[in-house]
Amino acid sequence: MTASSDARIPDQYAARLVDPKAYATDALHETYTWLRANNPLGIAEVDGFDPFWVVTRYQDLQDVSRDNQRFPYGNRPSTLMNRASASKSMQTQETPLVLSLIQMDEPMHMKYRMLTQPWFMPANLRKREEEIRQLARKSAARMVDMGGQGDFVSGVSLNYPLEVIMNILGVPEQDLPYMLKLTQEIFGPLDPDIQKTMKDIPAAEMSQIQQAVMGEMLGYFDKLTEERRKNPTDDLATVIVNAQVDGKPITSSALNGYYMIIAT
């Protein structure tokens, strides 16, 4: 993995990387195709942003993600932000709202990962096997009720994985439609059909919408946290909210990070 002598990415390609609207068009595919062929390890310089490196080849990405000594995550935000947004974020909160495993360097990453790893051992998961099979039967029944024709995604594939995850987490069954709504709103920009309705929404407004949805989801998990501290059960939420690292309860941002990485 070596940068070329002129590693600077041409302006038209660099600008697309920070333009939310580009992610709803084929222009982004063209950009990454050009980068992989001509400048796989380049630096983007865009007005309003600090210069940032862009790694586009698979093996290089693997090398970077596995070498946290040379490429530490540090205290940088999990998403690319312009200077104004980064400054505002630093001024309005002392610690990040969400700190997940994917944002942690060693040795912190392993300490937090080990908090829940025992819960996912086969012996423990077998205790929930019948509940998960019941969810699968309900999902299959919904498909049968379509009468041989219907939307498999909205009728089956969106619901069943979420139902299993929420069962593991400890979310009550009656709250599943609400959680499905929130997860769809968070990941709406990745859906080609939703992209068509979003393409004309200004980037700043879109960011506000997604932040509001995330805040709503975290508000729900705050209530779940309070409930599990009062009434612990055998679910994963109970493990997370009562977890400790180095003899101290985990921070609210780390707790939020665990919820988000599991729920989404």
What are these regions (language model features)?
Residues 161, 221, 240:
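Conserved hydrophobic/aromatic pocket- or pore-lining residues that grip, position, or stack substrates
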Residues 144-149, 230-231, 245-250:
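Short, glycine- and charge-enriched coil/turn segments that flank and shape catalytic ligand pockets
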Residues 172-174, 225-234:
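Proline-centered turn/helix-capping motifs that create local helix->coil transitions or kinks
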Residues 121, 125, 226, 245, ...:
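Alpha-solenoid HEAT/Armadillo repeat architecture
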Residues 180-181, 229-240:
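Short, charged hinge/linker segments at domain and secondary-structure junctions
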Residues 1-153, 162, 166-180, 184-212, ...:
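Active-site substrate-recognition loop segments, prototypically the cytochrome P450 B′-helix/B-C loop
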Residues 213-230:
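C-terminal domain-closing interface element
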Residues 158, 162, 214-218, 245-264:
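Central I-helix of cytochrome P450 enzymes
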